[in-house]
Regions:
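Domain-level signature for soluble enzymes in the chorismate/prephenate branch of the shikimate pathway
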Residues: 1-303
Length: 303
């Protein structure tokens, strides 16, 4: 469990975007088995559920090791009014499923979320299947279950196959064996990790000043103070073509002296710094680092 679930006035529920059987549903069940996962149609709705007190946490996917960042999340987090209190990494295993009576010979097209289709692109090409984007992986499984079309299949989780009564035609059809999605857990109130109690991550947003070399100078403090920045992404703010807003993850706690100095230097070249959360680093990070250090490179699935 990535974050404690002490008694609270809010319901023992965790919100997620999608339909029952979605990977977010699976992540919520694995990370918080004592909380009830509740589905919402959009990320905004899942976030609002926490703000309104309908749910204690929101399980929000933020990036995938194969497909990159999840669209729209970077725009929602700054104005969400919530805080990151934990992170969770889910090993994504996509299953090719269809109605009873269908087979690899009968199916012609596959429904799924755009990211899932992209993560299975090589496999679908090899099988000669046409990808058809839908809003959600689990929703695609539901659509197939409601149809009598034996030429249409879905890519979704094993949980979705169980929920919607579909037959798995081919297991683990993702192209990369290291396909992993990182989720952040959002709460209404901040709950910073304790300093000195294990590895810590800090996530923040910043806007650099509109002067030459501002970003270069802003990031210098992290290098000179030995603070490891594990993520840095820019994105355009609404109504402008200037990519001056940045989303960053660093290793360390804001009370750590090196982090303090790095953030202080960052402030000299920024017009805004917003810390979204300081939380325990997932054990997955250490496992991935050890794997990389050992020289074991994740392999692309070829069959």
């Amino acid at each position: 469990m990535p974050h404690r679930t002490e008694p609270s006035d809010t319901p023992a529920k965790i919100s997620y975007q999608g339909e029952p059987g979605a990977n977010s549903h699976l992540a919520a069940r694995e990370a918080y088995p004592d909380l009830e996962p509740v589905a919402y149609p959009t990320f905004e709705d899942a976030i609002l559920a926490v703000k309104s007190g309908e749910a204690r946490y929101a399980m929000i996917p933020i990036e995938n090791s194969v497909a990159g960042r999840v669209a729209d999340i970077h725009y929602l987090l700054p104005d969400a009014g919530l805080y990151i209190v934990a992170e969770y990494f889910l090993r994504v295993r996509h299953q090719l499923m269809a109605k009873e009576g269908a087979s690899l010979e009968t199916i012609k097209r596959v429904l799924s979320h755009t990211q899932a289709l992209g993560q299975c692109r090589a496999t679908l090409r090899k099988l000669g299947l046409k990808p058809v984007p839908e809003a959600d992986t689990a929703g695609s499984a539901r659509l197939v279950s409601e149809s009598n079309d034996l030429a249409t299949a879905a890519i979704a989780s094993r949980l979705a196959a169980d929920i919607y009564g579909l037959k798995i035609l081919k297991s683990d059809v993702e192209d990369e064996t290291h396909n992993t999605t990182r989720f952040v857990i959002l709460a209404k109130d901040p709950d910073d990790a304790e300093p000195g109690n294990g590895p810590v991550m800090t996530t923040f947003l910043f806007r650099v000043r509109n002067v030459p070399a501002a970003l270069y100078k802003a990031l210098g403090g992290f290098a000179t103070n030995g603070v490891n920045m594990t993520k840095l992404e820019s994105y355009q703010e609404e109504g402008t073509f200037n990519a001056t807003m940045f989303f960053a993850d660093i290793e360390g706690h804001p009370v750590d002296r090196p982090v303090q100095l790095a953030l202080e230097e960052l402030s000299f070249f920024s017009t805004q710094i917003t810390i979204l959360g300081t939380y325990p680093a997932s054990p997955f990070r250490k496992e991935a680092a050890e794997l990389a250090a050992s020289g074991q490179i994740p392999l692309k699935r070829m069959s």
